[in-house]
Design a protein with these regions (language model features):
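Extended beta-strand/beta-hairpin segments
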Residues: 1-26, 33-113
Length: 113
């Protein structure tokens, strides 16, 4: 796997390289989907889910550096939206990535159709 920071000479040499934010998004979305399905099984709810994580790179006003924020978009097929919203919030409490980032980065949960 090629890794390169956007805007660097290495990124120009390896235009298909991934970056740390993409890796974080991939890991978080996969982990969250697993947590969501775990919670659903506990509640005897079966449905197809898809989780997409979008990572934003933001200015950190505290130290003038940078920070990230994440939006998790969750789609569920075969489950009512209201029930999915409840499951998503429970999954957010359970997910290891959510636990690790809680209080450190802004995470937005979106249930989409």
């Amino acid at each position: 796997m090629d890794l390169a920071m956007p805007g660097t000479p290495r990124a120009k040499e390896l235009p298909n390289a991934t970056n740390p934010e993409q890796l974080f998004a991939a890991g978080y979305s996969a982990c969250f989907d697993g947590a969501l399905q775990h919670i659903a099984r506990q509640e005897h709810v079966k449905f197809e889910s898809q989780v997409t994580a979008s990572v934003s790179f933001l200015k950190d006003e505290v130290d003038q550096g940078f920070k990230i924020a994440v939006t998790l978009q969750v789609k569920g097929q075969g489950v009512e939206k209201e029930k999915l919203e409840v499951l998503v919030h429970k999954a957010h409490d359970f997910c290891p990535y959510s636990k690790a980032t809680r209080g450190n980065i802004e995470v937005t949960l979106e249930v989409v159709e």
